[in-house]
A protein has these predicted regions:
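Residue-level signature for tetratricopeptide repeat
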Residues: 17-18, 52, 85
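Amphipathic alpha-helical repeat scaffolds of TPR domains
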Residues: 8-17
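Canonical tetratricopeptide repeat
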Residues: 13, 48, 81, 115-118
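Register position in tetratricopeptide repeats
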Residues: 20-21, 55, 88, 118-122
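Structural signature of tandem alpha-helical TPR/SEL1-like repeats
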Residues: 21-34, 56-68, 90-101
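TPR alpha-solenoid repeat register
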Residues: 10, 45, 78-79, 112
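Structural marker of alpha-solenoid helical repeat scaffolds
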Residues: 3, 38, 71-72, 105
Length: 126
């Protein structure tokens, strides 16, 4: 960030890491928002915005960002995040649909089974 203050991915990576690894959500939000200002159409930045909104319990906003990210790039982590948002929001059917779509693209991804198991979804592998 010091070397290249215009490098959106650096802000995004730092913000997402803070979001996932610490309780410093406000600081994470600042970095993710800076990344978004620099590159609002980058799928990973949109994913981070969505995941941040999810952590803040802003589920509708989270779904918007994550769907926007998926329109730009089909990426397993984005599908996993979107499914978890839907599940937490209570939309179990939509969560299952998102995971089915991901399973078509990544049939052997262990992360899919792990998420189903963690959320205690039906048909989760034990």
């Amino acid at each position: 960030i010091e070397i290249d203050p215009g490098f959106a991915n650096a802000y995004n990576s730092l913000g997402y890491t803070l979001l996932e690894q610490t309780k410093r959500i406000k600081e994470a939000e600042r970095y993710i928002n800076q990344a978004y200002q620099l590159d609002p159409r980058h799928p990973y930045i949109l994913d981070s915005k969505g995941w941040l909104a999810f952590k803040q319990k802003k589920y509708i906003k989270a779904i918007e960002y994550l769907n926007d990210a998926l329109k730009l790039q089909k990426e397993l982590d984005i599908y996993l995040h979107l499914a978890e948002v839907y599940w937490t929001q209570g939309n179990k059917r939509k969560a299952a649909d998102v995971l089915k779509e991901a399973e078509k693209l990544w049939p052997d991804a262990a992360e899919l089974s792990a998420l189903k198991k963690r959320l205690k979804m039906p048909n989760a592998q034990n």
